[in-house]
Amino acid sequence: MGLSASSPAATAQSAAEPSKQHQVASPPSECPMHQEKMRGCPMHMKASDRRAENTDDVPAHQERAYEYVACPVKSGASQVNDDIDPSNMMPPPNQLPSPDQPFPLSTVREESSIPRAHSDKKWVYPSEQMFWNAMLRKGWRWKDDDITSEDMTNIIKIHNQNNEQAWKEILKWEALHAMECPCGPSLMRFGGKAKEYSPRARIRSWMGYELPFDRHDWIVDRCGKEVRYVIDYYDGGAVDKNYQFTILDVRPAFDSLSAVWDRMKVAWWRWTS
């Protein structure tokens, strides 16, 4: 789940990008369309001093992310100055075009459906420009590939859909704890571990299956309890109309007896169903 920082203000051209992308983003909390008071779960609504204690869990880029979420009646965004990003082990990218960038990219960001821990907001996905800058920082060079602005639009859609799919799979596991956490889980932080193959992935490879092309670990807040989920990403072939091509293997890590018991139960249900 690549989420990134933002820096300069989005231009009127950037604000018009959603129609070009055929992508409707949820209005930000400050948008006039969002006047209804949000209702939060009492178990997630922390006191102000508790939130202050958990500021290190919140990525710097998420604090101002809603300034780049498209609002139907508001365009532009104020300047953002983020210095650190403590939650995803990456320096914060920005919304500035790279020096030799061949075409303009949208700086509009889409709100996800994933609740952010210790907050009444959702996680916000990176813009096309942020994703481009992140790939450059990791060593990618656009001149080596035949890539267009439309390709970047599709890459963002695939990226966002993969994360939505991953969260839905996590919610299936969390349904086992609905009595324990009736308000539902929220995402605290995450990290990519593409070359740190899980034991399950290695065992599958020994059996002749391909290794995953990526791995993420997501840390979920289950009403005050931290739960780590391992997500292995496998190539599923052609991209469908919903921008899904990845097969996800999502399960709680063996960090506790509760997680072990959950996986034993689910394995038994799958075996006997």
From Swiss-Prot:
The name on file for this protein is Holocytochrome c-type synthase
Q: Cite the source lineage.
A: Eukaryota, Metazoa, Chordata, Craniata, Vertebrata
Positions of region (Disordered): 1-39
Q: Which reaction does it catalyse?
A: holo-[cytochrome c] = apo-[cytochrome c] + heme b
EC category: lyase
* Chief place where the protein resides: mitochondrion
Regions of biased composition (Low complexity) lie at: 1-18
Q: Family, per the entry?
A: Belongs to the cytochrome c-type heme lyase family.
As recorded in UniProt, its EC number(s) are 4.4.1.17
